[in-house]
Amino acid sequence: MIGNEEHLGYDNTPDLEGDVMDAPICIDDLEQKMLSQEQVECPVFHHFGPGVYMREAIFPAGSIGLGHKHKHDHLCILLKGKLAILIDGEISIIEAPFTYTAKAGRKIWYALEDSSFMNILPTTETDVDKIEEIFVEKSDHFLNFEEEAKRLISSVNLEEHL
């Protein structure tokens, strides 16, 4: 997925057998590997209410995702589907409907089914870029990936391809 979206994903089926947390996971290495793979389209929808922002992302079955680092604890709801997700250092299988409070930090998940996942953040801000500045921290790997994608897109002369 390219752009200002929160979630990165690529097609790959992990081995969920046994204790997948036996070896420490290096998030930076995982993210760098994920960004080198073909990206999966994960649509994001923005919902606003009085004092609340809700960010809904759609994850296709078979995709792996890694979210940006959240600066604060926040509410999450799995609206549809089934995910294997890292919660409090353990892989949990969650199935919709499922609500929990996510601690500050990053989420890693594997979509076992087509899924719809929502982060809920307390804010009156309605500018998504400003909301991201307030609530998430993007890694250097992602910022470099995003910059390179924008550079490649801007270098394409569409008139040549028409």
Locate predicted features:
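Short hydrophobic/aromatic-rich beta-strand segments that constitute the beta-sheet cores
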Residues: 55, 66, 85-86, 102, ...
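Glycine- and acidic-residue-biased ligand/ion/polar-headgroup-sensing regions
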Residues: 70-89
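Short acidic-glycine-tyrosine-enriched beta hairpin
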Residues: 84-108
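Structural motif
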Residues: 75, 82, 106-108, 114-116
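Conserved short histidine dyad/triad with adjacent acidic residue
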Residues: 53-70
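A short, N-terminal "cap"/entry segment at the start of jelly-roll beta-barrel domains
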Residues: 1-56, 88, 145-162
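Double-stranded beta-helix
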Residues: 112-162
